[in-house]
Amino acid sequence: VPRVLRLVAACALTVAAVLPSSAAAKVPQGFFGVMVDGPATETPGILEREAPRIRAAGAQTVRFAIDWASAQPYATAAEVPEAERARFTDVDGVPTDLSRSDRIVRLLAAQGLRPLPVILHAPDWAAKFPGSLLTDPRRYASPPSGPEPYARFVAALARRYGPTGSLWSTVPPQRRRPIRTWQVWNEMNLNVFWNEPDFQEGYVPLLRATRAAVRAVDPRALIATGGLTNGSVPAWTALRRIYEAGGRGSFDVVAIHPYTRSAAGVLATVRATRRVTAARGQRTIPIVLTEVAFSSSGGDSPDARRFATWDTTERGQADRLRSTFRLLARQRRALGIGGVSWYTWLSPQARRANWSSYAGLSRLSGDRIVRKPALLTYRTTVRELSR
């Protein structure tokens, strides 16, 4: 990580030196978004209360996770315990429970928000490294054993939530927000999400199979790569490996998670990513930042020292958010930036948690939700930059 961050910092100095001073250009509808996870989606009642606030903050796209392992934990109906059978329906021969994602998609659509799902986590029956998370840490990070079960699952999601999806049959037309973009996995260049060397060897077939399966349901659907982040392998190098493994043509959107110390560093990662796509003849393929954030632990997080480059105070978090959004809006056309989502809406912020637990625009404090300075800054900056 330190070497990657030094590279980003060096590029950022160049970026900062050439930035125009003119006001940021306005962005189209859907450009700004936010992630909902953790307590926002897992604690009963919170998303019901927070979805209107997300809309009021100016977010137009909301990214959320669909956990494949939770939706399809059993390979066959015979494996389902009798006490659980009522919650499953048969989908392509696999017992499936979509109640969690149904709830989230309905809540977001009711507020006029665009759902952006990231689909990850292989169930044991479809995992390359099956086994309990408690006894085998690879379980959480295991890639699928093959691409087809995952591709069939995402195609089933498209039949449920796409333009002709069955979910919308009871929803008034004006309140429908069908899903058109599907994000395949998350941060595959980190072993906490894909615990196998040379991730691209298994990931490119997954992309290709998923795109074919989803396009058979919705010919205009878009497939986004999982968010490539600046880990030990930087985002642009990970993307280059996807291309080298034959990935061109298997995705429609490049997604990145440019965690770094500053707005200029974020833009430097976007520029490096664009150089890779241009070298492969894809100068105009959209680049979307499906996560960007700065931690506000102020050094309180135990890994703040390790990730000090993007750790700051609550006030510093708000300032960096404003700078980052303005810079991305200003460079949107030149670099083909398709959107940016803040990670995350609501943090648990248990004391001395890891850095990501301080990334939210709001935080839990006991049973209360505390609004951080970054939330007001998000709202005012999005209003400033939106058409």
PLM segments and residue spans:
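Aromatic-rich peripheral "rim/lid" segments of glycoside hydrolase catalytic domains that contact
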Residues: 78-83, 178, 183, 188, ...
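Noncatalytic carbohydrate-binding groove/subsite architecture in carbohydrate-active enzymes
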Residues: 44, 151-180, 195-315, 322, ...
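Conserved, mostly hydrophobic/aromatic
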Residues: 34, 62, 108, 157, ...
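Sec-dependent signal peptide recognition
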Residues: 3-10, 166
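Acidic-and-aromatic substrate-binding clefts and catalytic sites of carbohydrate-active enzymes
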Residues: 37-48, 67-73, 92-98, 124-126, ...
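Substrate-binding cleft and catalytic face of glycoside hydrolase catalytic domains
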Residues: 57-231, 283
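Boundary/entry segment of secreted carbohydrate-active catalytic domains
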Residues: 25-61, 65-67
